[in-house]
Amino acid sequence: MAAYLFTCSILQTLSEAGKIEIAEDKLLHYLGELPGTPNGPVQLLENICTILEGQGRATHGNVIRHVLNIVVTEQELGGLGISGKSWEEVDEHTLHEIKFLTDAWLTAAESRAAARHLPQPLKQQDTRRLPMNLAEKILAHHAFSVPRRERVVAGDLLRVSIDWVIASELSWVGMKHSVTSLDMKPSAWRNDRFWLSGDHTVDPRTYHDKRVQALIKGLESAKRDLKMTENQGSNYTIMHTEFVRERAEPGMLVLGSDSHTCSAGAVSALAIGLGAGDVMAGLATGETWFKVPECIRINFTGQPAWYIGGKDVILSVLKQLKRNTYAAERIVEFGGAGAKLLSCDARFAISNMCTVRDPNDRPELKPTADDRSTSRNLVLLQAFLFPTVSLNRLSIAAGARYEGASYASTFEIDLGEVEPFIAIYPSPDQVCPVAERTGMRFDGCFIGACTTTEEDLVLAALVLEAGLKRGLTLEKGKRIVVPGSLPIVKNLRALGLLDIYKACGYEQPAPGCSLCLGIGADVAEAGSQWLSSQNRNFQNRMGRGAVGHICSAATVAASSFNMTLTDPCDLLNDVSETTFKEYLARCKVARGGSESKLAGGKQANNVQYIEPCLLGENARSAEGEVPALEAAAVSLDDARLGSINSRIYKLDDYVDTDALPQIIPAPACVGSPTDEMLGSHCFELTNPDFRDYVRSGHRVIVGGRAFGCGSSREEAPRALKGLGVQCVIARSFAFIFGRNMPNIGMLAIVLTDEAFYKAAQQGENIEVDVEGRVVHVAGQTFPFSLDDMELQLIRNRGLAASYQKLGSKVFAALCQKPAPLPISALADATLAQGGSIGRQMDW
């Protein structure tokens, strides 16, 4: 009976989702009632594939065959794992999942056909084309139109299509809130291009918790409501890990509601973390907007020691360049002869930590070209690029083809000089050699987080094995290892490396963020000292009052015997480089042994270098549409905004979303809090009087440099809004925060005039004339710059409200008016006056 009912439901799904009709007389064959017919769901799908292919329905046949591949793939590799099972051996839940997958992937075929297709790339360079760096090429190729045929340049406002959206269970709450708060339902322009993973707070040890149950329910609801093909469920993978390993491709444009989205730069994708509402609009429309950023180039030279991985390389970069200096709000493009020697895992670790930010340290590394950014102190832009291989399966030009491209600065890093480093609490760029700090004592050692890759985990296990063979004893302390995904867990188990971790006293929770975020099942105790291979070591990151220092997994492993900082090089002398490489090769074979879960995915054997196609305002895209902005078809709110009259609340530089001074504590973001609920926790750890001041009329904040640095959490500006803050004025804003403010309908103003900050004291009366773009304080008037797009977003009460009014045409409407002054001109004018560029360089 189960077989009959399931077969009927599958045939109904084929009819409704794929418009596929199969003759009634075929039904008995599916049920195994004809002699010699095998029995079970797998055989049913096989037979359907055969019939569809026989009918000439190759596309639909490929879809069902892809579903079949998922059905037989092991559960640890993301499948259902029912290969060879009979009807009696497959439970009802699994049958329901097979039906869902069939429906979802048939829907994906339709949504893929309906979505905008990028124009065909050029097989050879246009002789009229001027050189562009990789980020410019990717943005130009994804643009609906570009302002000139020769190239795009920093400051150009582009309406672009996107390839992927990624989110966690925690950021999905904010994404969903941005539309449900306006009585709209979440939607996706393509149901096969939304990667959602439960990793930040969900954990099998806390599945019973009501807040965790609500998050898990949110994941499941998103899967069903959007017919998601890429919903990873809970604790299958940290959101970035398997996305980069399985989905991201060179030349793609990826949006994520997480600041470490830039991890996909490891495979030459342009991947950028944004706020939840911003990403939700991208998910609904398949579009967004950017102002083309400036780019710096870091050339790797020399050859690293065989045991040097991405973590030590990026710590070396941070040590020399520092944060918020040359790379502030810019794309970072890595290349050079040394880049070829870095594995994809090493590139992942480097990319992952390109999102860190903060203090005033001056850069020690001298640029090899003229630099215009020494006065900046802003957030490092969330993107990272190695100029290599394909643009959506066709290769984008690399190496010599970037000659003549525009870079704000160029640097060189000698990989031969990289050694084991440690970043001292509480800043990822307070870096020094491990050898200079040996002897530091720890209460705990943590190997994990998305930045800790498969090869890092393999090498750390071999270091532990070397220590065991030497007879090293384990001193008292807490030890935790958290691989980034179940496929990595499977590989480590097959190599016998999980047993080594167990022998060394390491707890092994399910894949997730764990101590790197410190708000789930694993929270470091107040006052405890930790050595960790995670990516951030800010105050309260691992747990309130806990202290964390970050380094490579190999260094953590070597230090975990006596819980004292130990240079891993001694134990690495006992590790065979050959064995290490053999283990990595076995991991690679295991990964290559199963087909890609992405339907239609193909491995390119021959690299073909191509150039992006630049569409002019009247050019046609691949499906023949005219991409010119539909100015006549959309209307915007022209209502004028009144002035803001308030008193000032004064804050300093580097007001943070994550670290201290902290706008909103991470635990307050869990669940589905309203703006008002978030506001009740605003600055509660560092400025407990802040909320009373705002309620008494101090509704304009005056801050300093890099206001809102930290993560992509949109809850930070929402908390300010929920409390009643009307405007934030600062010398500069962190990229994501500065973009989040107008997206939720709030005013963020950059002022660099020193006279303003002398006049704008705590409690001083202030008037902000939004339409006139001037601020009045202490009898003085200060003009400010505000893009037409930002002004329109504020008039419309934010991006979500704009989408509610304009629907899929929202970005066409918002992008129809150019910025009043090219951003490059703003930068030149500001620098000429000796000021800081600030958020005028946002894109």
Swiss-Prot record:
Molecular function via GO: hydro-lyase activity; iron-sulfur cluster binding; metal ion binding
Residues that coordinate or bind substrate: 258-260, 536, 541, 712-713
Domain of life: Eukaryota
Recorded metabolic or biological pathway in which this protein acts: Mycotoxin biosynthesis
Enzyme class: lyase
UniProt KW Metal-binding keyword: yes
Binding site for [4Fe-4S] cluster: 450, 513, 516
Protein role: Aconitase; part of the gene clusters that mediate the biosynthesis of AM-toxins, host-selective toxins (HSTs) causing Alternaria blotch on apple, a worldwide distributed disease. AM-toxins are cyclic depsipeptides containing the 3 residues 2-hydroxy-isovaleric acid (2-HIV), dehydroalanine, L-alanine which are common for all 3 AM-toxins I to III. The fourth precursor is L-alpha-amino-methoxyphenyl-valeric acid (L-Amv) for AM-toxin I, L-alpha-amino-phenyl-valeric acid (L-Apv) for AM-toxin II, and L-alpha-amino-hydroxyphenyl-valeric acid (L-Ahv) for AM-toxin III.
Family per record: Belongs to the aconitase/IPM isomerase family.
Matching NCBIfam families: LEUD_arch
Name assigned to this protein: Aconitase AMT8-2
Species whose genome carries this gene: Alternaria alternata (Alternaria rot fungus)
Lineage of the species this protein comes from: Eukaryota, Fungi, Dikarya, Ascomycota, Pezizomycotina
Gene: AMT8-2
